[in-house]
């Protein structure tokens, strides 16, 4: 209890006097641990036989840094993240018998997020994210390094409504692409709409005691990962893996004591992609069919840490 109070006081001191740069959007996750399970499904490609399932888990820690001069108010968010993707496949690389194969991929990133106040109602939200994405089965190379970035310009119309437009360069579709972004937020004491397209669309309702939030969530995420060793279920020599999924389903957040939240979601994983690119740039499609999923996570989110959602995706 003493440790939690000390942490809370530190974050509060970072944000006192910066109300012009803090956009009342959503609670900011200082610490987040999450996992998701996707059972095996048949491969969609007609020429391939087998099933593929996934298990994801990750952790992130964010540290705020407040900067204020006589003219400008700036909030920096330093976030370190680790993600782990397990690919569990049963397939035949040739015309022979089925082969069971597990492969683990890792994603380590540092995200520098910035909220800069142009005027009292206009803000610029910037994210810069150098990333290491690899199977870590050989020494790191230049191919293991990625760079992702996004910029949003956000208008706060009033305490409830916010909207914005921007551009991102990221791997959410399983490939490195430039992607236009749109933001729309509406929040009252009983309902919260949080839309950052194409990243997420959340519609959550709040119980009268504010201890339970429930509703629907949709989220798109993906990565491009360097592959350095043999994949037993594929005969080609694979150089790179592209993975993405869109999850849609009901969600519930239980607000626990001392600013901790328990987050649960289930539903369907759709619009999935699993592509293996070999050394000759041929694409081997092993995308599985739509699948149910279940996700669970825990987060630490003090009430006063309410930062623009473009920094908290």
Question: Locations of the language-model features?
Answer:
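Transmembrane beta-strands of outer-membrane beta-barrel proteins
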Residues: 29-33, 72-80, 124-128, 163-167, ...
